[in-house]
Design a protein with these regions (language model features):
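A conserved beta-strand-to-alpha-helix junction within the catalytic ATP-binding
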Residues: 36-52, 58, 62-66
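Conserved micro-motifs of the catalytic ATP-binding
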Residues: 1, 29-36, 73-81
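Short beta-strand/loop element within the Bergerat-fold HATPase_c
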Residues: 104-116
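Short conserved segment of the HATPase_c
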Residues: 129-141
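Short helix-loop "hinge" at the ATP-lid/N-box region of the Bergerat-fold HATPase_c
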Residues: 97-98
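Short alpha-helical segment of the dimerization/phosphotransfer core of two-component systems
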Residues: 8-16
Length: 199
């Protein structure tokens, strides 16, 4: 009983610490420089590498897609923004898709260019999200399944931060979900003036 109490207190302290860090991160969103030259394929690879231990624990495969049909596999894809914030946005999305996936499922991340936009997609093979919750999932502290809060960990701010990162980069985010094929988050952002002039 004492061990369970100690574990519970430890978990609560860790959660509180993570909450404070996340709130501090969110308070700094407007002040972070957004002039970094970001190569997206490398950034995605970094995020997937950092989340590989969690994916292995949950028995979920992480997949990175190349630019798509007609594009060279090693073709670089840049956008202008905050390297720190775009990393955090992708990290939160992929982490969320891992946690809510099924065992032996997969998470696929891709980045393509469409005219003067970059389209980032993160897809899972989970059970999907109820249509009624599609907008609510971006609200702070909202959880679709509150009964799994302790199991899944976190503080309920991951997707709220994702939405704010997208917003400060003048982008958009959409959610497509199906109970049979999982959930896909699609983020669209402008590539930046410098790169538009270069092409």
């Amino acid at each position: 009983m004492a061990e369970e109490t100690i574990q519970m207190v430890t978990e609560q302290n860790e959660r509180l610490s993570k909450l404070v860090r996340t709130l501090l991160d969110m308070s700094e969103l407007q002040t972070v420089s957004r002039n970094d030259r970001i190569e997206l394929h490398s950034l995605i690879e970094e995020v997937l590498t950092d989340l590989e231990p969690l994916a292995q624990e949950k028995k979920v495969e992480l997949i990175q897609k190349s630019q798509g049909a007609g594009a060279k596999a090693d073709e670089e894809l840049f956008l202008t923004g905050s390297d720190i914030l775009i990393y955090r946005m992708l990290y939160n999305l992929v982490e969320n898709e891992i946690k809510y996936n099924r065992e032996n499922g997969s998470v696929t991340v891709s980045a393509i260019r469409k005219k003067n936009e970059v389209v980032l997609t993160v897809s899972d093979t989970g059970n999907g999200i109820d249509e009624a919750f599609r907008e609510q999932i971006f609200e702070p502290f909202f959880r679709v399944d509150k009964s799994r809060s302790r199991e899944l960990g976190g503080v309920g701010l991951g997707l709220a931060m994702v939405r704010e990162v997208v917003r400060v980069h003048d982008g958009t985010i959409e959610v497509y979900t199906n109970k049979h094929s999982g959930t896909t988050f699609e983020v669209k952002m402008g590539i930046g003036t410098d790169f538009e002039k270069a092409v």
